[in-house]
Amino acid sequence: MSCKFFHLKYFPLFFVFFVVSDVIAQQVPFTVEIEPVIAGPLPKMHSFAFAQSGSKWLFVGGRTNGLHGFSTNDSFDVIYASDVITVIDTATWSWYSSPLGVLPTAVADPLRTTNMQYTRIGDYLYLTGGFGWDSIANGYRTFPTLTAIHIDNMINAVVYGTPIALNIRQIYDTNFRISGGEMQQMNGECFLFFGHNFSGRYSDPPQPTFTQVYSNQIKRFTINDDGINLSVSNFTFLTDTNNFHRRDLNVGNVVHPDGTFGWCAYSGVFRKDCNMPYLWPINFDPTNGAVVDSSFSQTMNNYTCAMEPLFDSVQKTMYTILFGGESQYEFNPVTQQLILDSLVPFVSDISVLVHDQTGQWSQLPLQLQMPGLQGSNMKFVPNTFVPSYSNEVVKLRELSGRVLVGYLVGGIVAVVPNGHPASWANDTVYRVWISPDQVLLAVNDLKPLGQVNIFPNPANNQVTIRTNFNGAVAISLLDAQGRVLRSENRFERKDVIFNTQNLSMGIYTIQVTIGDSISQSKLVIVR
């Protein structure tokens, strides 16, 4: 659910109907490509819950128009709430739907909501919360529901037109009165990240027509389900009223350098001290809990968007591709500069978050952009035949050639970066291709041993480069054309500090040379 102040800036919408690609030299060891699926009109939708089985995709909830309105007269209009359960068969690109109106009102209303949290466990899709119209209470609210849907049985019911009610079970618990958060599961436990409880008719600027309470929590619990009886137990709560005050974010699967699994919470809105997104990520796993990493600022793709995670098992590095959405900074591929827009507009930027085995972060914008201002509340659907870990992180080193890793589905399409009237729900599916660059992977494998830390990154007035190598090291700061702007040689272990206050915003390179080996890392300068 987006809550932001807008001004109008008019730019033409540009659709790409051919394959486009990009790779950042010496940084991202793979190429990304996007191409539209040529099919008949597909359902328009965003902010839905999702599951897949074989070639079929299951969609529940969400909205069928674009960005919600900002007055009490047009915000989250009931007529644009998805009133059907939809199935798309990707083998033929045909689709089917069943109306929710056949269900009891108390069951159907939570399934018409926006920004439910959801996760899959075995044969079931579990949905929590969501914001929408409560027909019984005659008002808008966030629902306190947990719904279990048998995925295969529901898909068959929708496709063949048989009753859907037998495949739905629902219980109430106030812990689930959340929307705009994220839900994950691991080893039989579920985790409900952040979000908020919103009730009433939304308006901006705020009026006394609604109440809003942020969760400020990661809720840990167990779902007990024998296929007939549904319950929850073992709730524990991790609370942080400053760093967990987030919603409408991405929570992505990650593989740690030691091979264990976890999640990372990326950005989200809104900070308590201003109407701006959070920029620092939060790493979380069931064993170690939550670790806020304030050493890094995620400047791009700050709102819920499609994302694809990959892991390099040799370099022990996570790559997370973020597709479009809304950003505090926009990337200009011509000037190679980042441009601040405090209104956090819709963007077409695609970036890659890189988290290496030393803990160092960077965010690299690609020359490739989305086909228009889209990506917000879009879903990345993985290709289940791609070599992946059990948490759906792609095994980068096992890819060979050009690989279809998944699809981009749904989301909001905007005509202008800021302004809500001209937007709609996306009805085009895009294929996403990844081609590993074996040359760059080999170059990465030959990088000098030892840790190189660059902080802060993004930087403003100065940047520090720290290495643990005891010997001759040459450290240089290069511009986008490869020209040396700063350089220093050192012969003992100590920090090198470059003054960057006179540099323009943009993407630079830190080059570390040890003997015949060269390591390069991107540095982002912001103002």
Give the location of each predicted region.
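Blade-edge beta-strand/turn elements of extracellular beta-propeller
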Residues: 27-38, 93-106, 154-174, 221-242, ...
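Beta-propeller and closely related beta-sheet repeat lectin domains
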Residues: 46-50, 112-118, 179-183, 247-252, ...
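Beta-propeller blade signature
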Residues: 74-94, 139-157, 205-227, 277-289, ...
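Beta-strand-rich domains and repeat architectures in extracellular enzymes and scaffolds
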Residues: 36-80
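C-terminal outer-membrane/trafficking sorting elements
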Residues: 21, 25, 445-455, 459-527
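Blade-loop segments of beta-propeller domains
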Residues: 75-122, 132-134
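Loop/turn-rich, solvent-exposed surfaces of beta-rich toroidal or solenoidal domains
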Residues: 301-395
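Asp-box/WD-like beta-propeller blade repeats and closely related beta-sheet repeat scaffolds
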Residues: 108-115, 132-186
